[in-house]
Amino acid sequence: MGVEIWLPLERWKDQRCFRLRYKVEPEPRPFLTLQPVKVSPDPEWDPRWEEWHCYLIPLTIDIQDYQQLLAGCFDRVFHTKDPIDGWPMDSLDLCSPNWLGEEDWRTILTAIRGEMGEASRRKRKFYDTFLRWLEAALTHTSIIVAEGNQ
């Protein structure tokens, strides 16, 4: 039996954030957290906060690292639509939850792979770790929320 990746909804405090860092900066810093969503097949589903805070190992990235290494790749998916309600999204809002669907994440994966060829060894390691986390998360969900704390 493998590790259960989804926590019971009432145990969201048991999440173990994986902190991916390129630059080592003193804490606390603004960051971006990627929270896979426990998707329901119910057509009337309206996700509760706990349903996007119950993935065992969400990913956290310092905002500075995001802006330097990933923002250009994320920008390629905008203008997009919220995968739940279809609401248009023009850019990633670092102050609130951003619901991105699997197609958006696959576009981001492709963009990052394109960046890896010209990247230094250290950047490639950062990108590779990000890609492995994201690909693993996408085997469990089709929606991941990107939420900043600014």
Regions found by a protein language model. Give the residues of each.
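Acidic (Asp/Glu-rich) sequence patches and key acidic residues
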Residues: 1-142, 148-150
